[in-house]
């Protein structure tokens, strides 16, 4: 049974501006596993796409959960890593989580479906 569906869309330029102004942004948004992947990218545009995609995923997850970020879950409580096929995955106790992330040059979006 579906518990919730969440969608988020963000401008990559917004994340890029935050990244330039806030030195701790990566630590606030990404888990250690996600930071490892982020640091593997040499291209700044690809780093911003990844960061924006994970930001959107965590927002979408919190919307699907029904609580929003900050109430019951924070950015670093949500670990979105890729499986061996490259598919983004979130493991969260009590739920089967379906994740889709996409981006263009200017936008990143994510959809999350939670099943119980």
Curated annotation (Swiss-Prot):
Its cofactor is Mg(2+). GO terms for biological process: fatty acid biosynthetic process. InterPro entries: 4-PPantetheinyl_Trfase_dom, 4-PPantetheinyl_Trfase_dom_sf, ACPS, Ppantetheine-prot_Trfase_dom. It is found in: Cytoplasm. One of its GO terms (cellular component) is cytoplasm. Its EC number is 2.7.8.7. Transfers the 4'-phosphopantetheine moiety from coenzyme A to a Ser of acyl-carrier-protein. This is Holo-[acyl-carrier-protein] synthase. The lineage of its organism: Bacteria, Bacillati, Bacillota, Bacilli, Bacillales. The gene is acpS.
């Amino acid at each position: 049974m579906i518990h919730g569906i969440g969608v988020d869309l963000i401008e990559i330029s917004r994340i890029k501006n935050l990244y330039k102004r806030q030195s701790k942004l990566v630590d606030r948004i990404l888990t250690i596993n996600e930071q490892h992947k982020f640091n593997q990218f040499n291209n700044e545009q690809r780093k911003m796409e990844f960061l924006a995609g994970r930001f959107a995923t965590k927002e979408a997850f919190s919307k699907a959960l029904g609580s929003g970020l900050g109430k019951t879950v924070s950015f670093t409580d949500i670990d979105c890593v890729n499986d061996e096929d490259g598919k983004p995955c979130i493991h969260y106790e009590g739920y089967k989580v379906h994740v889709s992330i996409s981006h263009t040059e200017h936008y990143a979006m994510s959809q999350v479906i939670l099943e119980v």
